UniProtKB/Swiss-Prot annotation:
EC supergroup of this enzyme: hydrolase
EC number: 3.6.1.26
Name used for this protein in its record: CDP-diacylglycerol pyrophosphatase
Primary subcellular site in the record, as a coarse category: membrane
Source species of the chain: Shigella flexneri
Keyword presence, Hydrolase: yes
Membrane-spanning ranges: 4-24
Keyword field: Cell inner membrane, Cell membrane, Hydrolase, Lipid biosynthesis, Lipid metabolism, Membrane, Phospholipid biosynthesis, Phospholipid metabolism, Transmembrane, Transmembrane helix
GO biological process: CDP-diacylglycerol catabolic process; phospholipid biosynthetic process
Location(s) in or outside the cell: Cell inner membrane
């Protein structure tokens, strides 16, 4: 029994080290691709030629761009027009920073335009990965379809999700998640990053270890989903795992 336990521990350590090495390999020049697209292509083209290309939209005064992602037919990314690395940035808990999740929700219309018909709100999800859960250094929120199994699980737990951050029964995709119900008026007034930092104990000091997602519920409220990095359980806090970029839910 002792040997079996030791072997299990060794396997966990190897997995953790491998995850760390994988992350380290992805922090080179390629990790700046999105930032270069925003700062060196989309923003200058909009300012000089009133053309957002290669982005779908550039809003310099509002501080964001929307870019069609190469992965998936309907996936878009919302990104700032200035340097923000990710969930670890203290700018995200600054009240003067744009409410990027609310802006990303407004940008879901790009999915419908691309699809050629309205994409139901229940099929849409927003997600941002933790510091170790993403491969790009520039802050970006994924706007994409939700996985059908995640949609079903959230529907079943509708009555269990309250206005406080509480563990979601059963978690999602094999990982633990906190869930919080949010009304549209709350979302307009206050960033989900601030809700997480101010309401979850010790979250403010470890924001970079969290992935965050948002989905609309059948009662027109929203549910915020937060997962924290835990390499011992092989959770890199990649909240994007709740999404399906091939959009099976629309078929």
């Amino acid at each position: 029994m002792k040997k079996a336990g030791l072997l299990f521990l060794v396997m966990i350590v190897i997995a953790v080290v491998a995850a760390g090495i994988g992350y380290w390999k992805l922090t080179g020049e390629e990790s700046d691709t999105l930032r270069k697209i925003v700062l060196e292509e989309c923003l200058p083209n909009q300012q000089q030629n009133q053309n957002p290309s290669p982005c779908a939209e550039v809003k310099p005064n509002a501080g964001y761009v929307v870019l069609k992602d190469l992965n998936g037919p309907l996936q878009y990314l919302l990104m700032p027009t200035y340097r923000i690395n990710g969930t670890e940035s203290p700018l995200l808990t600054d009240p003067s920073t744009p409410n990027f999740f609310w802006l990303a929700w407004q940008a879901r219309d790009f999915m419908s335009k691309k699809y050629g018909q309205p994409v139901p709100d229940r099929a849409v999800s927003l997600a941002i990965n933790s510091r170790t859960g993403h491969t790009q250094n520039h802050f970006h929120i994924h706007i994409s379809c939700i996985r059908p199994d995640v949609r079903e699980q959230l529907d079943k737990n509708l009555a269990n999700i309250s206005s406080r951050w509480l563990p979601l029964p059963g978690g999602l995709r094999g990982h633990e998640y906190l869930a919080r119900r949010v009304t549209e008026s709350e979302l307009v007034q206050r960033s989900p990053f601030m809700m997480l930092a101010e309401e979850v104990p010790e979250a403010r000091e470890h924001m970079g270890s969290y992935g965050l997602a948002m989905v609309r519920q059948s009662d027109n409220s929203f549910v915020l989903l937060a997962t924290q990095r835990n390499l011992l359980t092989l959770n890199r806090a990649s909240a994007e795992e709740i999404q399906d970029h091939e959009c099976e839910i629309l078929r």
